[in-house]
Amino acid sequence: MLDKSRLRIAMQKSGRLSKESQKLLEQCGIKINLQQQQLLAFAENMTIDIMRVRDDDIPGLIMDGVVDLGIIGENVLEEALLTRQSQGDNPCYVTLRRLDFGDCRLSMALPMDKPWNGPKCLQGKRIATSYPHLLKQYLDKLGINFKSCLLNGSVEVAPRAGLADAICDLVSTGATLEANGLREVEVIYRSKACLIQRSGNLSKTKQSLIDKLMIRIQGVIQARESKYIMLHAPAERLEEIINLLPGAESPTVLPLAGNQHRVAIYMVSNEALFWETMENLKNLGASSILVLPIEKMME
């Protein structure tokens, strides 16, 4: 039986969010040993339990107060919310923040040989999907009537099997659609992974731990988006060079030993440093230009 005094976090056991969720928790300093078939794991260095479940179970675990935090795709969360609302429930939860992985889109797709002149083409059509409520919400706003065909997997084969005229499914690259003779025609929902918390009061211990995790998650995400830049530059071109660099803060400028005409510049960049920028820096006299990844960051 779970110790209710420990913080409980639900994450996807397997699937497109599983590895990134585990990586995020580990980068936040949570020491866990997740075996392939293990559904429950205990952090070695924090009072945290990790529950590994199906992604579509996570919203219910949060809304019913079984776990404290969950990492879930916004598409799954919104579908679960609409499902419960359609049943007369009023589920509650708190979205703490969007995360920097799990990008996808929920899109309409048609067979390659079918014409597309906008959503009105779907009037009266049969549409296969795993997201019936998101689909209904979108088409209801446009005043389009349709017939829903609920499938929990292999949605893309529905038109070829004669089950549906079109599909509404998650798309990342579009390769699966193309392999099944389909083309993406309309994006109805864009999604990323997010961190959610159950509603209601938590103990001071749990809330303090969540606050600590939020600071660490912010640091991990900011570090992923930032680079540490080091270079040598002529002192007379210093202002021009600094203006080229997209910095999070003002750079550190130090004199080079034995060379009064050149300086060393160190800075954290919160934007990508492209090859063109590096070439422009070199044209201004910069040398020994290094762009390094940042593992952790706290402001």
From Swiss-Prot:
Q: Which PROSITE patterns match?
A: ATP_P_PHORIBOSYLTR
Question: Where primarily located?
Answer: cytoplasm
GO terms, molecular function = ATP binding; ATP phosphoribosyltransferase activity; magnesium ion binding
Q: Which reaction does it catalyse?
A: 1-(5-phospho-beta-D-ribosyl)-ATP + diphosphate = 5-phospho-alpha-D-ribose 1-diphosphate + ATP
A Gene Ontology biological process term: L-histidine biosynthetic process
Enzyme class label: transferase
Give the protein name, as stated in the record.
ATP phosphoribosyltransferase
Q: Which organism is this protein's natural source?
A: Blochmanniella floridana
The beginning of the lineage is:
Bacteria, Pseudomonadati, Pseudomonadota, Gammaproteobacteria, Enterobacterales
